[in-house]
């Protein structure tokens, strides 16, 4: 027998619905006259859109932007989240209105990074933060892209990468002789860590430390947890549930800080302000001589947070970029051959490629840009927040509003790229194929924009170029016939590809 609801039950249900609707409306900020709130889909009570986002939020939000526009709003739990798409809209927010959108949200996962003192993840955005960011940028540039007077290389970065690329070539050859194949990521990660370690710590960076190797090979724990949309940041009860992922994230951050603190302390023991040879030395010198005004002088305990940011910026992004590059090239052998033909013509085989060759190697540069664009391995920037009430595209955005920047959508916008899902490096070349199309190259979004743009962007681009140039000059990369390479991204702060242990590398000529 069917049971029909009574009038009392219907009345109670209607009352409950109205109460929930009233509470939700009461939480929403008042919108000034003449403006409107950003549009977006209705979400589930209490949950919001967390189930809608699924395992690939960048794809879901890109589809929603087609319906609701470049400025849309969702909820994760009870937290409203502004989602920005479209290059013009994102530039307007992060560049033209950069002061309005330069904040960082106070998220739980961010508080676990260097105990909440990270320059990149902390909610600080005032004068002290700006001064320390400039200091970190200056120190990074000095010991990476600035010239090295004690070396024949053009800069510190070229010197470090050239040495590590040679070591990587040797390891790949040994792996081929012993096993017959290798996993690119596990081989590249050590070389990239040694490069940024040498720039940060010089001779103090350990070469064969088990602690270092353990941290390097477990770095995926960080990107698997510090991503846009992590439920632990929106449902506070999850902070008290000891899930394995959260426990590993806490442990990894603690171990990394302890590792860096130990190296910095050793560095301090023999510090000589008249003989500065690395980033840590430059920061220690600034501690002694800097002014306290506007945060210009930093306390010793803050050095570890700056070094953590620099080390992270120069490590994970570059490792992921090179690993993706090799996977794209084994699945597109004709593109790999074109790069190698260009290297043979411009560089030859008698010497190694150098950073000064970049302008003469446009096809390699175009291929790197296309790998950045097509993979979009950093799908979102680190989340932003508004620093004050503002407007964007006619929509009212209140202060302290959480903001997601969908870089994946920008890099796959059909209005910009025409055929965004085709892997075609040639799109970035000028009509005569001799140079990079600067206007189009600046539309690739991978390092953010504006006041929070990644301080290691130039370093990362140069490092990826030089590693790939040296590797591709010497080796031909492939997979055995019948092996299918899975290029499906695994979502995270940086997206990894499915690990492949079947990559092979053979000398293109006698390696000297």
From Swiss-Prot:
Chief location category: endoplasmic reticulum
Catalyzed reactions per annotation: an organic molecule + reduced [NADPH--hemoprotein reductase] + O2 = an alcohol + oxidized [NADPH--hemoprotein reductase] + H2O + H(+); 17beta-estradiol + reduced [NADPH--hemoprotein reductase] + O2 = 2-hydroxy-17beta-estradiol + oxidized [NADPH--hemoprotein reductase] + H2O + H(+); 17beta-estradiol + reduced [NADPH--hemoprotein reductase] + O2 = 4-hydroxy-17beta-estradiol + oxidized [NADPH--hemoprotein reductase] + H2O + H(+); estrone + reduced [NADPH--hemoprotein reductase] + O2 = 2-hydroxyestrone + oxidized [NADPH--hemoprotein reductase] + H2O + H(+)
Residues annotated as glycosylated: 65
Keyword Lyase listed: yes
GO-annotated molecular function: caffeine oxidase activity; demethylase activity; enzyme binding; estrogen 16-alpha-hydroxylase activity; estrogen 2-hydroxylase activity; heme binding; hydroperoxy icosatetraenoate dehydratase activity; iron ion binding
Cell location: Endoplasmic reticulum membrane; Microsome membrane
Keywords: Endoplasmic reticulum, Fatty acid metabolism, Glycoprotein, Heme, Iron, Lipid metabolism, Lyase, Membrane, Metal-binding, Microsome, Monooxygenase, Oxidoreductase, Steroid metabolism, Sterol metabolism
Protein's job: A cytochrome P450 monooxygenase involved in the metabolism of various endogenous substrates, including fatty acids, steroid hormones and vitamins. Mechanistically, uses molecular oxygen inserting one oxygen atom into a substrate, and reducing the second into a water molecule, with two electrons provided by NADPH via cytochrome P450 reductase (NADPH--hemoprotein reductase). Catalyzes the hydroxylation of carbon-hydrogen bonds. Exhibits high catalytic activity for the formation of hydroxyestrogens from estrone (E1) and 17beta-estradiol (E2), namely 2-hydroxy E1 and E2.
Similarity comment: family membership: Belongs to the cytochrome P450 family.
Subunit composition and interactions: Interacts with PGRMC1; the interaction requires PGRMC1 homodimerization.
Entry protein name: Cytochrome P450 1A2
Source organism of this protein record: Felis catus (Cat)
């Amino acid at each position: 027998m069917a049971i029909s609801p009574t009038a009392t039950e219907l009345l109670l249900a209607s009352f409950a619905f109205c109460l929930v609707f009233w509470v939700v409306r009461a939480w929403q900020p008042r919108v000034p006259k003449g403006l409107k709130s950003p549009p977006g889909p209705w979400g589930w009570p209490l949950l919001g859109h967390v189930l809608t986002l699924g395992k690939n939020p960048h794809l879901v939000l890109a589809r929603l932007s087609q319906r609701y526009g470049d400025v849309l709003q969702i909820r994760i739990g009870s937290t409203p989240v502004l989602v920005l798409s479209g290059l013009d809209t994102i530039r307007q927010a992060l560049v033209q209105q950069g002061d309005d959108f330069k904040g960082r949200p106070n998220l739980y996962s961010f508080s676990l990074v260097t105990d909440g003192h990270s320059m990149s993840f902390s909610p600080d955005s005032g004068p002290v933060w700006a001064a320390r960011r400039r200091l970190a940028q200056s120190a990074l540039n000095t010991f990476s892209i600035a010239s090295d007077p004690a070396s024949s290389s053009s800069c510190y970065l070229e010197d470090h990468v050239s040495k590590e690329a040679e070591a990587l070539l040797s390891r790949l050859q040994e792996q081929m002789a012993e096993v017959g194949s290798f996993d690119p990521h596990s081989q590249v990660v050590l070389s990239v860590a040694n490069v940024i370690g040498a720039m940060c710590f010089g001779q103090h960076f350990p070469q064969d430390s088990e602690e270092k190797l353990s941290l390097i090979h477990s770095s995926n724990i960080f990107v698997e947890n510090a991503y846009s949309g992590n439920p632990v940041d929106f449902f506070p009860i999850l902070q008290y549930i000891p899930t394995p992922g959260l426990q590993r994230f806490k442990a990894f951050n603690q171990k990394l800080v302890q590792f860096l603190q130990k190296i910095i302390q050793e560095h301090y023991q023999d510090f000589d302000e008249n003989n500065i040879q690395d980033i840590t030395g430059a920061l220690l010198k600034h501690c002694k001589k800097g002014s306290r005004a506007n945060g210009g002088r930093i306390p010793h305990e803050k050095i570890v947070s700056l070094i953590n940011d620099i080390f992270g910026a120069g490590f994970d992004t570059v490792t992921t970029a090179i690993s993706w590059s090799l996977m794209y090239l084994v699945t597109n052998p004709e593109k790999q051959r074109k790069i190698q033909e260009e290297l043979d013509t411009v560089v030859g085989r008698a010497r190694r490629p150098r950073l000064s060759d970049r302008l003469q190697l446009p096809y390699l540069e175009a291929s790197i840009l296309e790998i950045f664009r097509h993979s979009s391995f950093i799908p979102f920037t680190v989340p932003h927040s508004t620093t004050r009430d503002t407007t964007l595209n006619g929509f009212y955005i209140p202060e302290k509003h959480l903001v997601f920047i969908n870089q994946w959508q920008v890099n796959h916008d059909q209005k910009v790229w025409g055929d965004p899902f085709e892997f075609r490096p040639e799109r970035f070349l000028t009509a005569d194929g001799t140079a990079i199309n600067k206007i189009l190259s600046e539309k690739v979004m991978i390092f953010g924009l504006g006041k929070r743009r990644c301080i290691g962007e130039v370093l990362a681009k140069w490092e990826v170029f030089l590693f790939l140039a040296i590797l591709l000059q010497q080796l031909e990369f492939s997979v055995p016939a019948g092996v299918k390479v899975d290029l499906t991204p695994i979502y995270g702060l940086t997206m990894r590809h499915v690990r492949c242990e079947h990559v092979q590398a053979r000398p293109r000529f006698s390696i000297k």
